[in-house]
Amino acid sequence: MPLSQIRIVHQDAALLLALLAPPAQAEDGKRLRIGITLHPYYSYVSNIVGDKAEVVPLIPAGFNPHAYEPRAEDIKRIGTLDVVVLNGVGHDDFAERMIASSEKPGIPVIEANAKVPLLAATGMAARGAGKVVNPHTFLSISASITQVNTIARELGKLDPANAKAYTRNARAYAKRLRALRADALARLNKAPAADFRVATIHGAYDYLLREFGLEVTAVVEPAHGIEPSPSQLKKTIDQLKALDVKVIFSEIDFPSTYVETIQRESGVKLYSLSHISYGDYSAGKYEEEMARNLDTVVRAIQESGA
């Protein structure tokens, strides 16, 4: 074959390889670095990507996301990421400020709640801040599954080489989450009575309780982390008595004496739930803590004779 023809063949082959080559990220073997803001999203993303990508918390374990203020070293970390997964509906507003101040203000962002039906927010502080939705969607199995599917789909667009693996892993994870809920519901002989009323210390648990067909009758705190005034506390206790509320759900290790006052004055039974927002990050954290939450709600219903 003439040398000129060999060159043409080589050029055509090189062009074909370039057209068929996977995205640069897959080509050089580099794994995606995915930033997350909250513990549930670490679990979601870790179970979706397996060993195909790296999951990086934006804030270290031990910080309260409700009180967190961005630090320089945490903002700098965003420059090492390829994408950030957000709750995006009010629970991680700090991330928007961090991204805007980082080396990558245009970094791709996945809003996990894009397809989740949202509940209205409660409390004066929420209304005063202009927030009209409850951001605690991760405390619902149903909403979590929707978020997992959204995250897997969007990650697949950024990393096509691993898109099938992400979808497969998301389905397996969703199956386990459904099994958690099904097991909890199966332990109830019947649905709670229509007049079975519950209250919560703050507005985090509406999504969880709706899994059992329960509506929250009263919320004690005006907003998450803001203790009620003495007059507000008295009004709440009177309301719990008048409405014959049987159960109040608090938060594990909730550091407040007024919870005991409510329990003593109103006669309600107190049960503690996890907000899944503290401690170490791990792939299994969400399943472990949600299993305990579901067990607690089942026990509350059974012990109240509902």
Where are these regions (language model features)?
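Bacterial N-terminal signal peptides that target proteins for export
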Residues: 1-13
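Extracytoplasmic metal-acquisition and chelation regions
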Residues: 26-306
